[in-house]
Regions:
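Beta-propeller blade signature
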Residues: 54-65, 112-127
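A structural motif
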Residues: 91-98, 122-132
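Sequence-structural signature of mature extracellular/luminal beta-sheet repeat domains
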Residues: 36, 117-118, 125, 129-132, ...
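Conserved loop/turn at the beginning of each blade in beta-propeller domains
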Residues: 19-20, 81-82, 140, 147-151
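Short pre-catalytic segments that frame enzyme active sites
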Residues: 104, 127-142
């Protein structure tokens, strides 16, 4: 909507609607006024296995069109389960992007296993690169983008503007 008028946006990602999956979050880059970058988390059926899992995409938004789309992260493997995709996006004051992925209905294994994607909060540079000081960058077989693990289904996340701490809200 702009000035009370509805507009269509072209170039949106293919979003899989399955159970609790769909479009999860949209966040503008902190410098959106200069770079027009927008970020999405959504359920995607692309990748390994049947079903879907959570993806983080960046795109440029101009004149009601998304262009230069790039999937920055895609949880794998896909799951046919329809619950706990997460997800929220937040930027810290240093420009790092954080996003969450729910445990996808496997609460006893996924959150505690750093070789698996689900049940985590991730940290990336805004272009998708993995920061060299992430906690598990040098851990064999670990998902290098993990910032914290042991989460069930983080569907709320903010950065404390005074301390820089991540506040996340878990369901369940």
């Amino acid at each position: 909507f702009k000035n009370g008028k509805k507009y269509s946006v072209s170039g949106v990602p293919k979003v899989t609607v399955r159970g609790q999956g769909g479009l999860m979050d949209i966040e503008l880059h902190p410098n959106f006024q200069e770079n027009n970058l927008i970020y999405f988390t959504y359920a995607s059926d692309e990748g390994e296995g049947s079903g879907a899992n959570t993806a983080l995409m960046r795109a440029e938004f101009k004149e009601n069109k998304l262009s230069n789309q790039k999937v920055l992260y895609k949880a794998s493997p896909n799951s046919r389960k329809g619950q706990h995709f997460g997800s929220r996006i937040a930027f810290d004051k240093n420009g790092f992007i954080y996003f969450s992925i729910g445990e996808r209905g496997n609460r006893d294994e996924n959150p505690q296993d750093i070789t698996r994607d689900c049940g985590k909060i991730y940290r990336l540079y805004d272009d998708g690169r993995i920061p060299e000081d992430n906690p598990f960058v040098n851990t064999e077989n670990a998902k290098k983008a993990i910032w914290s693990y042991g989460h069930r289904n983080p569907q709320g996340m903010e950065i404390n503007p005074f301390t820089g701490e991540i506040w996340s809200h878990e369901h369940g």
